[in-house]
Amino acid sequence: IAPLEPETLAQRTKADELLRAYAGTPTPAPARELQGASFVWGLAQPLLGLRVLVRHQDLLVRATLPVLGFVAVCLLVAEGGGGFLSWIGAYYLTLIGAAPLSPILFARNYARLAAEARPHLGLAPREPYLRTFRQSIVEAIVQLIVLGAGVAPLVGLATLIPWVGPIWAAVIGWGWALHWVVVEALDSARTLPATPGEQDFAERHAEFPELDLPWFALPQLWQLRGPAGAITAPLRWWAKWLGRLGAHWRGEIAIIEKRPWVAAGFALGSALLLAIPVLNLLFRPAIVIAASHVLGWLEDEPEGEPEHEHEHEGEPNERAALSA
């Protein structure tokens, strides 16, 4: 798929036209100050990932074979008496219940898929970042704790507010969940650096965890005295604990902090696909491919870069090598 020409994109101003353009072909992210376009670009990425997946047989085979094996196992688990309708019900319950295990079972396959998709996205080739099965299990458990307990105090306080409390609690909970949908996708699409021995975006942020805190851990830095300090002490302690648990994903969170509108669009687009039962097993590889495209353009983007001046072929830090 050839990257979209910038002058062609500049002529498309409506959101639906932008969405079709961004979902139709790999395109660099808009400038940071273009918040609406950045949101639409992020929203279109899962659709772009799905388009790339179905158009390239090598990616489709890698994505579907493990899923078919997973479905076959669920069919065997659901096997039993009680008639056809009971078997169908047991099968779908087994499939839906086991779906959260797919990031663990398919972690290495997703990593290879993300690396193999890069040339199809106009990005320089990279080697996959392969985790051990133990790493995948530990990271999944920690992420589950962070996801479940991260905003529990805020949700609890919100429910105490009359009338609108439950609404605010739901908004906080869903916002936190969508945040971690993006984090998990970016983490699954991580690749090894282009140069052996070089640090990637995640390793750079992991060097000084106490000096490079994620946004949700910043309350621990509050310097308050008197009653205010006593009242906020539990929140500061909670933020510190949460920051330690989330330190592994500091690089992915930094991309969200740097490009919040892109992240918001990507989260919404991914959530819409993942909300479809059973089919979300097939959509998840598309989201990994989409995250690979996002990382290709944003992982090495400077923190203070005012505008996006990337080339329209290749990867920002490797375009010279690609053009040679």
Describe the role of every protein-language-model region.
Residues 1-156, 194-200, 207-210, 214-223, ...:
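Helix-coil boundary and N-terminal low-complexity module in membrane systems
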Residues 139-179:
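Internal active-site segments that recognize and position negatively charged phosphoryl groups
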